[in-house]
């Protein structure tokens, strides 16, 4: 996914472009043996999913040595009431935005706008001057 942030500084339009990738990895199977409310043995096997969102600033003039910022989360999809794939992806994205903010890549205002983006499109265009977010499918 591609995110473009357009910002106007002293009448000059500046833009930043980010490439965002989402990756899912599974942990080793988790085995749990417990007793239910009637005293019967219950044997359960499930896997947790690690969701990783990586983001780097796209600059065609800079072909090497890009800093990649990542956000990860581990979701226990065994408990489907509390975790979903979409929620795990959103938490990992927020962690990635926090890393971009803490490293000074984006401003507070840009980070607040990036928090609103859901990673379900091909591209987003964020215009900070007019405060508009445009989804491009």
Where in the sequence are the language-model features?
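Classical N-terminal secretory signal peptides
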Residues: 1-11, 129, 136-137
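C-terminal binding/interaction regions
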Residues: 2-5, 14-33, 108
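Generic short N-terminal amphipathic or hydrophobic helices
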Residues: 2-4, 18, 44, 67, ...
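Intrinsically disordered and other compositionally biased segments
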Residues: 10, 14, 19, 23-25, ...
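Generic hydrophobic, helix-prone segments enriched in Leu/Val/Ile
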Residues: 17, 22-23, 34-37, 73, ...
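Positively charged, aromatic-enriched nucleic acid-contacting surfaces
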Residues: 33-89, 99
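Short, compact, well-ordered microdomains
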Residues: 90-103, 107
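Intrinsically disordered, low-complexity charged/polar segments
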Residues: 102-137
């Amino acid at each position: 996914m591609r995110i473009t942030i357009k910002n106007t500084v002293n009448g000059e339009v500046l833009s930043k472009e980010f490439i965002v990738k989402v990756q899912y990895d599974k942990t080793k199977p988790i085995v749990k043996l417990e007793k239910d409310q009637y005293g019967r043995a219950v044997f359960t096997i499930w896997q947790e999913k690690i969701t990783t969102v990586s983001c780097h600033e796209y600059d065609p003039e800079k072909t090497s040595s890009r800093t990649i910022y990542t956000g990860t989360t581990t979701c226990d999809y065994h408990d489907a009431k509390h975790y979903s794939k979409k929620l795990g992806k959103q938490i990992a994205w927020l962690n990635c935005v926090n890393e971009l903010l803490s490293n000074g890549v984006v401003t507070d205002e840009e980070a607040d706008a990036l928090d609103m983006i859901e990673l379900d499109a091909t591209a987003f265009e964020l215009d900070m001057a007019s405060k508009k977010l445009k989804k491009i499918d």
